[in-house]
Amino acid sequence: MNQDGIDVSYLKNAIATVRNATKPYEKNSTLPRSLNSLHLQHLLELSSRVVFHQIELENTVTIIRNNVAQWLWQVVLTGDKIIECLEAFRNYFLFGQGDFAISLVDQFEKLKTSRPKGLTIKDQELNSLLVRASIGTLAENDSSFEKFRFRVQNVNDKQFVTRTNMFDNITINVPLRFEYDIEWPLDLFVTTEDLAKYGDIFSFLFSLRRTQIRLQKVWTHLTITEKASSNNNNNNNNNKLNDNGSPRLILWKVLSSMMFFIDCLWGHVQMDIIETNFRKLVHRINISSAQHQQFRKLKIPEHKKISYANETNLVETEPFRDFEDIRIGHSTYLSDLLHGCLLESRVCSDAIKKSLNICDQICGLLERLNSNMVDKNISESVTKLEKEFREQVTFLFRTLSGLNKKGEGFGGPPRHLDQLLLRLDYSKYFSVWS
């Protein structure tokens, strides 16, 4: 379909969506008669031409599309409402609310220890957990938070396991989806597919943040046991912490390398990917909203407004013309997030998931240590898991390095891989491993 066909299709769908809406916008549910007359006049003039010119048709369709966009922006939605929705997604889908993220992880850890194995978990239980996690955080008084919910996914659902949703069951071994109840008119630019992508990113970020917090707690636990053991005079113990090459020293090294990797990955997805792309999207919506506000203040004919819009050049960022542009821009933003989180690469996602599982196993072993004594079996298990972790991280580093050079699977060498590799290898740490 050419651009004219796309524009005409947009006009039809946009107007039909408003007319069929269940919300009380009846008095504004149809285009003004003056606007209809203006559009009809343009079309009649075009049809009366002796010679057909494609450029005239394109100009006419552009005028009509921009006029309809102005009308939609006024009676349906404003840029502020869109940004409020995006900020809610940023806070909860993308873990922008740090206090809530920590509380949510804690609630899930409590659920794992208190829930009998084999007991079926229900949506109501998870949503009660969600409410408890919000207590004492900024989410508690956030009205947008009420629209979020958990859902236990049916194993018979289509496309149950894909490259992007493989992190759904890493938390409590039950496939969970974090969802949002989208309402009209926000569904003009947020589709069901978009919400599914947000759910995929949430599962990945939750798994990453949970592992990060757990490693930090284990580090604190080892520090406490070290201080406790330093008060004892067990200098004859071959396994004490201060012996060079001792099992306890190996534990610190393993934890340090794991925390470094997880911290690099978390910092990359939050700062280099999510925050950067979020700011760009919000900026485009802001300048688009400002432009629409400016049009409303100017008391000039509609066709003149279109000419003004075409002559307005914003050097920094191109504004969105209408909701279809916003929808496309938002979909592009989500695609950039998925690529930046490496979720579009099954190989990379699989390596990250295996690395997180290994970190979990290490934490499970070390959480049981209550003294400076390191059992031989624990020492051997940690050594084995550390080797597996090293293999996965080395494989991931080599894969990313190869993708960065060749651009395979990403449509060209993406800049975000440069940023991630720089974080990981700024001191040649992973180059030595590789």
List each model region and its residues:
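Long alpha-helical rod scaffolds of large eukaryotic non-enzymatic complex subunits
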Residues: 1-434
